[in-house]
């Protein structure tokens, strides 16, 4: 595995693969890798000739009072995991490599990015869309892989790629979970043992939402209220966002009527925000399927 730190070096390294018509699979991350990231890597390796992973903690997607400074970082550890996973290239730029001057160009998808998690984290998804579009321009991948745990992010990136005619196939990969159901996340390391035990309320709330919906609760306001009450049984958990949405468009649904729905949760346990989602209903939604941009 070759570790690369600059944009120019990366472009030079990928040039032979492009000339040979090889397909490049790209997994953008912020590092401190876990089983979920490694599943993205596995899919990228299976479906492409060359696999590239980026590790970049992007300051544009963190708010003023968020965890940019303490976000877990361990490049040596991550490089070892990626080497073992047989990744071809690791791109690990610095902030000055990615943003040598203050950014004046912002990529934003306001209707999708200002709701749900974006309502709790203003500007977050503009930062995500900006860095992902820049990485796509740098790497020029044939396919890029994102976890469905960050479902809103996946919808936004798909829409950005469609709107901007970026020639990359966006692949959503099913959420990878710990043995007790908690979604794998780099931020799980923030949790104390007591908080970690409490955090199981998040996937349990999705199970409860699934049960209630399949048993006939099809009023979105009633379902949101029931989920909030369920999470309220755990005193260490504070629900910040509970949203029932269309999984294709993220639009609010006046009535559910048995259609597939997205249940999105954004729950604070201690000082840690935990994100989880599930699509439930009677049919698999299009957004969870691979499709070409």
Swiss-Prot record:
Residues where beta-alanine binds: 61
Catalytic-site annotation from UniProt: 37 (proton donor)
Entry EC number(s): 6.3.2.1
Amino acids binding (R)-pantoate: 61, 153
Pfam families: Pantoate_ligase (PF02569)
Reactions the enzyme catalyzes: (R)-pantoate + beta-alanine + ATP = (R)-pantothenate + AMP + diphosphate + H(+)
Top-level taxon in the UniProt lineage: Bacteria
GO MF annotation: an example: ATP binding
Subunit structure: Homodimer.
Further details from the record: The reaction proceeds by a bi uni uni bi ping pong mechanism.
UniProt xrefs under PANTHER family: CYTIDYLATE KINASE/PANTOATE-BETA-ALANINE LIGASE (PTHR21299), PANTOATE--BETA-ALANINE LIGASE (PTHR21299:SF1)
Family assignment from sequence similarity: Belongs to the pantothenate synthetase family.
Protein name as catalogued: Pantothenate synthetase
Source lineage: Bacteria, Pseudomonadati, Pseudomonadota, Alphaproteobacteria, Hyphomicrobiales
Gene from which the chain derives: panC
């Amino acid at each position: 595995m070759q570790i690369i730190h600059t944009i120019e070096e990366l472009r030079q390294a990928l040039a032979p693969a492009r000339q040979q018509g090889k397909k490049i699979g790209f997994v953008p991350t912020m590092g401190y890798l876990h089983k979920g990231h490694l599943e993205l890597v596995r899919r990228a390796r299976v479906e492409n000739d060359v696999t590239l992973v980026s590790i970049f903690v992007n300051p544009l997607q963190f708010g003023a009072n968020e965890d940019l400074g303490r976000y877990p970082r361990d490049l040596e550890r991550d490089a070892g995991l990626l080497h073992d996973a047989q990744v071809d290239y690791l791109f690990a730029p610095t902030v000055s490599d990615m943003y040598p001057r203050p950014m004046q160009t912002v990529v934003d998808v306001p209707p999708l990015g200002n709701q749900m998690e974006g309502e709790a984290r203003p500007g977050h998804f503009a930062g995500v869309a900006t860095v992902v579009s820049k990485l796509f321009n740098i790497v020029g991948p044939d396919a890029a892989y994102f976890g469905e745990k960050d479902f809103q992010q996946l919808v936004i990136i798909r829409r950005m790629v469609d709107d901007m005619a970026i020639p990359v196939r966006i692949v959503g990969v099913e959420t990878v979970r710990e043995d007790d159901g908690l979604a794998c996340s780099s931020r799980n390391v923030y949790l104390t043992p007591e908080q970690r035990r409490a955090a199981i309320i998040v996937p349990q709330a999705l199970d409860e939402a699934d049960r209630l919906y399949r048993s006939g609760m099809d009023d979105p306001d009633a379902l949101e209220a029931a989920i909030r009450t369920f999470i309220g049984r755990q005193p260490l958990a504070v629900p910040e966002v509970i949203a029932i949405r269309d999984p294709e468009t993220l639009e609010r649904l006046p009535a559910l009527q048995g259609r597939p729905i997205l249940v999105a949760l954004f729950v604070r346990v201690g000082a840690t925000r935990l994100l989880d989602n599930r699509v439930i209903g009677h049919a698999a939604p299009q957004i969870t399927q691979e499709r070409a941009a």
